[in-house]
């Protein structure tokens, strides 16, 4: 069901706290929630969070009044998600599942989130299966929001972190730029280099969503050009500047690729 390298990477358990270092939300989380708040229909819409991890987005959406069900192929994530979903103020359900073969009935969901499957499914055919399944379970007019990692994420991260001379990292960057196939040979020992994944170009993500039959597809840059400014993010004034830049750049074709993550939003006709 899941690549062993991916399972071992997430088996470390760090994903639950990754977007909240020191208890504070990161730019990635803040901007992703901002886009969800803007693009989702009003609660109590039904949301299927396919590949939803430990409930990072399911919990706040449930707290807003959405009816959320999460599926994920990693057992630890499902266990953590069930713990998060047991809070009466943010209740949601969670189960083991694969975005390529959803158990939900056809036309049963208002929203499908794919915040993980499109970058961990490294083959184009598998990504199309996940998108087709999302389309199948959506009602007419329902929305898909699919997250991707940008093709240039390792290049920019390596530049700002000083990793481009690291012999364990540079080959990853070179391969990412060739075909987007990201392979970290040590996903447990060097989790900061991520794990097995496919990194999209903005145009490639758009094309895949349209190929799956979604209409009105728009690709958004999530973090914008300011995501390397991690220390500045803790300063409220600088934080607002970073968010301003992200919002200004989110759909500009020449700037989308500076974001670490992309979100494609589309509608089932």
Describe each region flagged by the PLM:
Residues 100-112:
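A short acidic, Gly/Pro-enriched loop at the edge of an enzyme's catalytic core
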Residues 208, 212-269:
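C-terminal lobe and adjacent flexible extensions of AdoMet/dcAdoMet transferase-like proteins
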Residues 121, 189-203:
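Acceptor-substrate binding/catalytic loop of class I
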Residues 56-101:
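Class I SAM-dependent methyltransferase SAM/SAH-binding core
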């Amino acid at each position: 069901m899941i690549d062993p390298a991916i399972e071992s990477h997430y088996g470390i358990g760090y994903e639950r706290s990754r977007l909240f270092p020191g208890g504070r939300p990161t730019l990635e989380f803040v901007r992703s929630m901002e886009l969800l708040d803007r693009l989702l229909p009003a609660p109590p819409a039904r949301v299927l969070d396919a590949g939803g991890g430990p409930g990072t987005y399911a919990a706040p959406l449930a707290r807003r009044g959405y009816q959320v069900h999460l599926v994920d192929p990693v057992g630890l994530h499902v266990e953590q998600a069930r713990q998060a979903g047991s809070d009466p103020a943010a209740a949601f359900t969670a189960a083991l599942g694969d975005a390529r073969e959803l158990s939900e009935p056809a036309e049963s969901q208002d929203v499908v989130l794919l915040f993980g499957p499109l970058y961990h499914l490294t083959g184009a055919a598998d990504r199309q299966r996940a998108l087709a399944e999302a389309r199948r379970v959506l009602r007419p007019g329902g929305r898909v929001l699919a997250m991707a990692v940008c093709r240039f994420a390792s290049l920019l991260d390596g530049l700002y972190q000083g990793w481009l001379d690291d012999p364990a990292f540079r080959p990853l960057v070179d391969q990412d730029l060739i075909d987007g196939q990201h392979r970290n040979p040590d996903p447990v020992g060097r989790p900061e280099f991520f794990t097995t994944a496919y990194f999209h170009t903005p145009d490639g993500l758009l094309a895949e969503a349209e190929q799956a039959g979604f209409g009105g597809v728009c690709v958004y840059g999530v973090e914008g050009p300011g995501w390397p400014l991690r220390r500045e993010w803790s300063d409220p004034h600088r934080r607002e500047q970073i968010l301003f830049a992200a919002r200004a750049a989110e759909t500009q074709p020449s700037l989308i690729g500076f974001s670490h993550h992309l979100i494609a939003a589309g509608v089932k006709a």
